[in-house]
């Protein structure tokens, strides 16, 4: 067998061997006793902070997938119009341990990444790897826009932080997660 064909065959075999359980890529052991026992649906007006379904009327944010549900692997939240009543946003910050993805469902925003301001609009996505200085800025008073924010991994403290903001609309220094500078 020629060298190119051998290498191509070997590379093509990796996914098959992985699915067959012959190759294990050191995945984190997952405790399947925790989290929901079946799929869940969270409606537009619902929130799931701490794995508990609620219908908050005056929330700034809605939790859609709780870190409790994913064993701290993932946290997904959506904004509500209330959070974008004023122009501005949180100060630029760094997450040492979490990647953050921002998806613009509707409206226009500015994502600040490593000193650069980037305008984002409906359908745009910003991926911010851990260790990157960033923030999201609302440039419009009473912005009707909506964003989805995804954090991964998502320690419980991350969800608690956003839960506090959802209820209070502000940030308390004593709830900032470890590694958020």
Where do the PLM segments sit?
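C-terminal segment of N-terminal export signals and the immediately downstream linker at the start
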Residues: 20-57
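Short, conserved beta-strand element in jelly-roll/cupin
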Residues: 80-82, 94-111
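Short beta-strand His + acidic residue motifs that chelate non-heme Fe in jelly-roll/DSBH
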Residues: 111-112, 128, 134-141, 147-149
